[in-house]
Each structure stands twice: as C-alpha cells, then as structure tokens.
C-alpha cells in the first residue's frame, strides 16, 4: 500500500504591518465645522453637509458638460474633488468670505494656511495611498490640461451654487440675514454661467425647485 506524503503547505502570506492612519477619523470631523458662523442661521449648516451638496452639484455639472456640450470630463473625479474641496477647514475652521477676501494679503496668507493644512492631512495617510488623495485634495490648479482646468471651474461653480441654495433656504425660512448674501452670490453665479453653460442649465432647470415644499416637489 502506497502512503502518500502530505502536501507541503505554502507559508502564509503576511501583509506588511502598517501604522494606523488617522486620515478618515479627521475627515469625519467635517460634521463639527459650522459654516456661516458670523450670521444668524435658521438652520445651521455644517461642512459635511456642504461637501455632499457640492459633490452632487459638481457631478451634475460635469454630466451636463459631457452629455450636452461635448466635454470629456471624468464626472466621478469631479464629484470627489467637490467632496474634499474644503477638507482643510477641518484644521483651519471656516473663514467667512468677507474676511478671507478683504485684501490680497489676507487672501494669499489664507491660501498658504490652506496648503499647509492639506499637507497635514495628507501626511496622515499611508505612503502608498498619498498620491491618490494628493490628486483629489490638491488638484493641479496650474495644470495646462484643458479638462483639468474646466474640472476645477465646475467645482468652484458648484461651491457657489451650494452657497446660493443655502441663502435661498434661509430666505424661504423668513431669515432676512441672508438677503445681501443671496444677491451677491447669485450675481457671482450668473457671471459664471456666462462662460459655463452647465451652470446656466442648472440654474434654469434645477435651481427653481429649491425652496419649494415637499408637496410641490413631488
């Protein structure tokens, strides 16, 4: 009788031990960062809510560009950039717009603070993941690639549209605190729509429904 020898077992494959990363624990704290902090809000808005709105709107704008205007944008990436676009504010807090842009010196100094905060966030990632998130948190603003430049314009427009929607919601709630902010933000968005037909389409087709009741929406 032949007795077969047991097959040799291959040694277990062990993945390299990696240090714990605090990146997503930090990102989860977006919910604690309050926006519009210098203004009386009928309903406070946190950074996490704003990030989701910007991501959804940015994805829509990119999709409009691809479907209607012959663009070849990566709509998923546009949404991701929108989702993380204010992540540095977890560290810096939300700087009110009138203060941030009060003069060129403050604006430039704040941008440097933002860049440092982004680097701090990226430093918490595992080394092999850092390049992926570097491209999302700090996209190539000086890129010569036309699609990349257009992507960042759409994310900026989505950010302003989200702010306009917040102003509309506050006005509908009877809060006169946001009247001036709504007028100035709407003016900025209208200017953007001159160069970005996707923004014009969003304003014409989607924006009017904001502020309606649930019965009106359905």
Set out the residue ranges of the language-model regions.
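Alpha-helical, largely C-terminal catalytic domains
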Residues: 1-218
């Amino acid at each position: 009788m032949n007795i077969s020898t047991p097959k040799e077992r291959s040694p277990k494959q062990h993945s390299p031990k990696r240090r714990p990363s605090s990146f997503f624990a930090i990102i989860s704290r977006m919910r604690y960062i309050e926006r519009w902090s210098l203004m009386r809000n009928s309903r406070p808005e946190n950074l996490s809510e704003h990030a989701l709105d910007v991501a959804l709107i940015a994805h829509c704008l990119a999709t409009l560009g691809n479907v209607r205007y012959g663009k070849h944008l990566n709509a998923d990436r546009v949404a991701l950039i929108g989702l993380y676009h204010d992540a540095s504010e977890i560290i810096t807090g939300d700087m009110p717009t009138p203060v941030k842009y009060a003069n060129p010196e403050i604006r430039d100094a704040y941008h440097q603070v933002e860049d440092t905060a982004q680097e701090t966030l990226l430093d918490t990632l595992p080394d092999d993941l850092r390049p992926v998130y570097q491209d999302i948190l700090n996209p190539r603003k000086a890129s010569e690639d036309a699609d990349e430049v257009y992507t960042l314009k759409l994310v900026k427009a989505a950010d302003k549209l989200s702010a306009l929607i917040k102003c509309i919601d506050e006005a509908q709630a009877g809060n006169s605190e946001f009247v001036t902010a709504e007028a100035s933000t709407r003016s900025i968005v209208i200017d953007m729509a001159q160069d970005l037909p996707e923004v014009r389409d969003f304003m014409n087709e989607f924006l009017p429904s904001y502020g309606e009741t649930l019965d009106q929406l359905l």
